[in-house]
Amino acid sequence: MNFLLSWVHWSLALLLYLHHAKWSQAAPMAEGGQKPHEVMKFMDVYQRSFCRPIETLVDIFQEYPDEIEFIFKPSCVPLMRCGGCCNDESLECVPTEEFNITMQIMRIKPHQSQHIGEMSFLQHNKCECRPKKDKARQEKCDKPRR
């Protein structure tokens, strides 16, 4: 029963969000995404802060830490990654569906060469709030037994 109520609640929230998104496209916003001196409504704040895939700038060296001999242009790439709040301290926002995307990146080897090559990056397609893994318990399980 709780699951059904939760599902109905989130379905209505999504419907409100999509309805608002339709009207938001019709009314141009200021550079910050909001009309000047306008108060952002609670449902907008709530929906935009909940766990979901959101465009995040990711440093290429974070994804390819062993490629230190290159300089990359651009040095970071826009990727969809899980982010947001779960409204419960025991939950975390994690990806449940992922896929690879290939992008053209300039790879520069200082004083030697530069070329545009393809690099693959992991994108998050769907996210969910799931129970946090207990790090202390996990470390205990990872330790070898004597």
Curated annotation (Swiss-Prot):
Glycosylation sites noted in the Swiss-Prot or TrEMBL record: 100
CDD domains with a match to the protein in the record: PDGF (cd00135)
GO-annotated molecular function: chemoattractant activity; growth factor activity; heparin binding; vascular endothelial growth factor receptor binding
Gene Ontology cellular component annotations, sorted alphabetically: extracellular space; membrane
Entry keywords, A to Z: Angiogenesis, Developmental protein, Differentiation, Disulfide bond, Glycoprotein, Growth factor, Heparin-binding, Mitogen, Signal
SMART domains: PDGF
Family matches, as InterPro entries: Cystine-knot_cytokine (IPR029034), PD_growth_factor_CS (IPR023581), PDGF/VEGF_dom (IPR000072), PDGF/VEGF_growth_factor (IPR050507)
UniProt keyword annotation of Kinase present: no
Disulfide bonds: 51-93, 82-127, 86-129
GO term, biological process aspect, one: vascular endothelial growth factor receptor signaling pathway
Signal sequence bounds: 1-26
Family: Belongs to the PDGF/VEGF growth factor family.
Oligomer and partners: Homodimer; disulfide-linked. Also found as heterodimer with PGF. Interacts with NRP1. Interacts with isoform 2 of BSG. Interacts with CD82; this interaction inhibits VEGFA-mediated signaling pathway.
Role description: Growth factor active in angiogenesis, vasculogenesis and endothelial cell growth. Induces endothelial cell proliferation, promotes cell migration, inhibits apoptosis and induces permeabilization of blood vessels. Binds to the FLT1/VEGFR1 and KDR/VEGFR2 receptors, heparan sulfate and heparin. Binding to NRP1 receptor initiates a signaling pathway needed for motor neuron axon guidance and cell body migration, including for the caudal migration of facial motor neurons from rhombomere 4 to rhombomere 6 during embryonic development. Also binds the DEAR/FBXW7-AS1 receptor.
Protein name: Vascular endothelial growth factor A
Gene name tied to this protein: VEGFA
